[in-house]
Amino acid sequence: MSLHISKLIEQYRSTKDNDLKYMLLRQNFKINDIEDELAPLVNELLLPVLVEEQDMEILNLVSFQVLPDLVLSMISDPAAAQLGWVISLICDPLLNQSMIHANRSFVLIETLRNVLQKIENSPHLDYHQPVNSSLEFISKFIVEMKRHMCDVDAAQLSHSLSESNMLIYIESLNLLLKFSFFSDAASPSVMVTLPFDILNDVFTIAQDYSATNTNESIDRITEKLLLTSTQLTHPVDLENLCPKMKYNTLAAVSRIWYKFGPIVDKLFTNRLLPVLFPPQMGEECNVEDVLEIVHNFHPYFSIRRLKDNRPLLSDSTISQLREGLFGMLSILNDSLTRTQNENDHGSDNLIDSDDGFGSDNDPEQQAYLDELVSEGYDENMYDGDTDDEDADDINVEKNDEATKDITETNKILLIFSELHYPQEERFSELLVELQTKIAINTSLIDKILSKETTELPTHNGEIADLNEILNEVKGNKPIRKNVIFCTLAHTLSLQSGSELSVLQLSIEVIDHLLVKNHSNNITRGEQFQLIKLILPHLKTNKSFIDTLKAGNFTQKIDEGVTLRTMILSLLLQLFPLDYSMLGEILPTIARYSVRDKDLGVRDLSFQLLDQILRTYYNYLIGIDWEWYKDDFYQVLQETCIKKDINTNLLLQFPPYLPHD
């Protein structure tokens, strides 16, 4: 033990003055060696304070500031970036002491939470936490967590005390998982999955705790634990966990929708669709939970896969989903109609009562009541309070039902905006009826009734001069779409053998059409058509390579670099690109652009890949996981290996690995 740490511990132990203790703990600790200085400081000073100290100011100082700040300062040191010591010297001793000193367990686990929270709130840190040591400690923590849960139940603590005790464990476990598995960019959550027994325990604890909560909804802290755990779950394990999940749990974790791809059709068939049809409707669960799950899963029926241009959900499942939701919407419409009629009827009754004999100002009635009171009758029998309270209860219940109906209606309409319901007259009529009862955003209705176009447009027309077309689009003049598209299709065709200057001029025209002039009303399909025309020109064209010779010196000059740079720059400006276009773009970039001999072109290609993957990675592994692995990732990997190219993209955005 170093001299200054030894002296500090001795000074603290030798004084009874709390002010002096506080000052000693407030000083900046300069730790140079983990084993020789940090370990004795924690074990011989800070842990004893947490276990023995009676002064709350000193206790809170160590728990919320001294220990968390000390750990953070150590992590910031590159020499201590391998963080096995955080578990062995900080977390494990805190947990062990909580098991020994039950009366201080809350303070000790709270301190563990504070340490991990301090690390999480400093995202700039660059560190690596060994997975094996984490898994061992996580298992130990869960065992203690379950034991504590049993002890709390046995002690029959008040609800608020029991809740705070369990929440601190739940929050700590969530932070522990994030610290262990989200710390290293080289090991993202898609590559690291928790063992099934740990996952099963986590979900069981979360659901058991939520079941004791008087509120039906899952609290935010428990929800965070469920979301973190789902991110660390392999789809194969999710398939085993789903049958045990309650609907409110599934509603929470379905926000990590991209993990459910391999099992989503079965999930709709077994768990979701039955709830949408009578007589099962609403009997076994909260309908709002099911609607939330369906909405969270909307990419599975709203986005077409790259490999076959079809949604991941089967046609029959989507058809049943439409039918079930339409039936629910019809029932909700009837309920809203009844509510509206009752409100109108109630309003009429109020108007009639003002003209009748029920007036509070009727002198004969008041005289009669006064006489009853004077004869000893209980005036409370006639004051109407009980009837008013019953009426208020009924009104509150009706208002709650109406609010629930409106919430469910809006959620169903949101789902239909992703479903692209077929243009059926009965659906349009139902929307018109609903608009008379509740406020519905017109843009939402437009989206619901819009037709989904998947076919690429065809253009027939004459071929015009490119310079003339460029002047036309630059001047924002009325555009002859057919002429422009036919001309570009001709000039950009590989078979046409266009000169380099013609190709560059074509790219400039497209740049004005898609980027610089947004008033040309280019549809999504037309944009895709133009992109398909330019992508083949990302491959180096040998006819644009000139060879210069001067004596024995030979130099090759690639005149096509400018063209390829223009194309990649255009694609970057069009970002975010439509998902449907990635099936053409990603393999082309992986096969040609990343291996381009020009470093500028190569750099632009990696910029584009980085943007695409950061935006669409969850969609690619959630909907197109097989295509992503076979048609893009392996192509990129082979290109990088063959050309000895280093990129972090292969580590940051891996495909799903086979499950053990």
UniProtKB/Swiss-Prot annotation:
One of its GO terms (biological process) is negative regulation of protein ubiquitination. Neddylated at Lys-16. Residues 339-364 are annotated as: Disordered. Changing residue 16 to R: Does not affect interaction with CDC53. There is a cross-link at residue 16 (Glycyl lysine isopeptide (Lys-Gly) (interchain with G-Cter in NEDD8)). It comes from the Eukaryota. One of its GO terms (cellular component) is mitochondrion. Keywords: Isopeptide bond, Ubl conjugation, Ubl conjugation pathway. Residues 351-363 have a biased composition (Acidic residues). Assembly factor of SCF (SKP1-CUL1-F-box protein) E3 ubiquitin ligase complexes that promotes the exchange of the substrate-recognition F-box subunit in SCF complexes, thereby playing a key role in the cellular repertoire of SCF complexes. Acts as a F-box protein exchange factor. Involved in the aging process. Longevity-assurance protein. Present with 195 molecules/cell in log phase SD medium. Interacts with unneddylated cullin CDC53. This is Cullin-associated NEDD8-dissociated protein 1 homolog.
